């Protein structure tokens, strides 16, 4: 799919991601933190939740493919077969990232965790540059750094006076715990970067292969292999298929107790099922917007939208509920919007220059 020059598709993608994140979070909080009436404990079964989420996303992804007409041109099973190795890698890094960051919270404070997650664009850039040798313009790199700095400042500004006490223990133990936490955060961010950059690379490589194939077809050259158009809907279906497999394997081989615990709680508190299904549905609908954005604009724009979500929610609260932000947070907001505005104006300038060049050639 060609990238649109209009700003409306990216605004549509951003609005869809923000809305789905908001509803998803509203269901996630009671599902995972509430002490249920009959079980007298929280539903702490992350891999069971991940399986339900992945299965729901596979189903929604399949219907998303059919709605786009992608299933007719390139079947879901054929896509899984053709891209099994990279899909298995991406789904593994995607499945491993969240647990690593959650384990890191045992050793670092929540602010450090939030700051690390605010800089997700940087590892994506580094994976593109170092592993895949992708050429990224200096302007796009500067925008990524500006957005990361802005979100970091915004997070620090909103967390003043809210940081809990430090980890107890001797200096050596404290250093070891902090080092362990930072290592886990680094691994989590690396997994995030590898996931997003590899998804991006798969879609871009497919577009190049399709362009070459179309050129060979027009020149009537012999084709050694037939390539099919890979869409965000294909990625959503296939990745969740593998995520489900990874988590089911983990539950069956390593943590069967989680299955027994989930079964016992669902039997005592069947209302959890409705929360679980609502959580899975909201997450699946959100993934439609996420993979649509990835298909149209790539991983850097997608990460830019997701890391600025909290900031956008705060701005909405200011407009609707009259909430206030401090000077430090306003500085972060200005930096983020300066970077985004600079990129938007630069793209508009490039578009006008291209149109003028086309008119001149005619």
From Swiss-Prot:
Main subcellular location: endoplasmic reticulum
Localization: Endoplasmic reticulum membrane
Molecular-function GO terms, alphabetical: UDP-galactose transmembrane transporter activity; UDP-glucose transmembrane transporter activity
Keyword Iron-sulfur in record: no
Residues the record marks as carrying a glycan: 196
GO cellular-component term (any): endoplasmic reticulum membrane
Keywords on record: Endoplasmic reticulum, Glycoprotein, Membrane, Sugar transport, Transmembrane, Transmembrane helix, Transport
Membrane topology: Multi-pass membrane protein
Transmembrane stretches, start-end: 7-27, 45-65, 111-131, 141-161, 175-195, 234-254, 271-291, 296-316, 317-337
InterPro entries: SCL35B1-4/HUT1
Family: Belongs to the nucleotide-sugar transporter family. SLC35B subfamily.
Function, as annotated: May be involved in specific transport of UDP-Gal from the cytosol to the Golgi lumen. Involved in the maintenance of optimal conditions for the folding of secretory pathway proteins in the endoplasmic reticulum.
Protein name from the UniProt record: UDP-galactose transporter homolog 1
Species whose genome carries this gene: Candida glabrata (strain ATCC 2001 / BCRC 20586 / JCM 3761 / NBRC 0622 / NRRL Y-65 / CBS 138)
């Amino acid at each position: 799919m060609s990238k649109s020059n209009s700003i409306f598709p990216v605004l549509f993608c951003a609005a869809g991601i923000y809305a789905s994140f908001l509803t998803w979070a509203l269901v996630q909080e009671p599902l995972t933190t509430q002490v249920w009436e009959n079980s007298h404990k929280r539903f702490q079964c992350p891999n069971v939740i991940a399986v339900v989420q992945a299965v729901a996303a596979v189903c929604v992804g399949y219907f998303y493919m059919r709605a786009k007409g992608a299933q007719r041109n390139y079947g879901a099973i054929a896509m899984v077969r053709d891209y099994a190795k990279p899909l298995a890698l991406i789904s593994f890094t995607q499945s491993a990232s969240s647990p690593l960051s959650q384990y890191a919270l045992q050793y670092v404070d929540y602010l450090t965790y939030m700051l690390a997650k605010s800089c997700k664009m940087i590892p994506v850039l580094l994976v593109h540059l170092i592993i895949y040798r992708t050429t990224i313009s200096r302007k796009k790199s500067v925008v990524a750094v500006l957005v990361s700095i802005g979100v970091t400042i915004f997070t620090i500004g909103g967390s003043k006076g809210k940081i809990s006490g430090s980890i107890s223990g001797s200096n050596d133990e404290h250093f070891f715990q902090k080092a362990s936490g930072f290592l886990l955060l680094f691994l989590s961010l690396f997994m995030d970067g590898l996931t997003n950059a590899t998804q991006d690379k798969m879609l871009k490589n497919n577009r190049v292969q399709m362009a070459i194939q179309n050129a060979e077809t027009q020149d009537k050259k012999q084709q050694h292999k037939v390539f099919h158009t890979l869409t965000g809907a294909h990625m959503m279906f296939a990745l969740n298929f593998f995520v489900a497999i990874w988590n089911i394997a983990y539950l069956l081989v390593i943590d069967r107790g989680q299955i027994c615990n989930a079964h016992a709680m669902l039997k005592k508190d069947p209302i959890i099922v409705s929360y679980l299904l609502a959580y899975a549905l909201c997450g699946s609908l959100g993934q439609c917007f996420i993979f649509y954005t990835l298909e149209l604009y790539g991983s850097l724009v997608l990460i830019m939208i997701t890391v600025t979500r909290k900031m956008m929610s705060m701005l909405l609260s200011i407009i609707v509920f009259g909430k206030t932000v401090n000077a430090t947070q306003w500085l972060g907001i200005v930096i983020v919007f300066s970077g985004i505005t600079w990129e938007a104006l630069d793209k508009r300038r490039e578009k006008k220059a291209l149109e003028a060049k086309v008119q001149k050639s005619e």
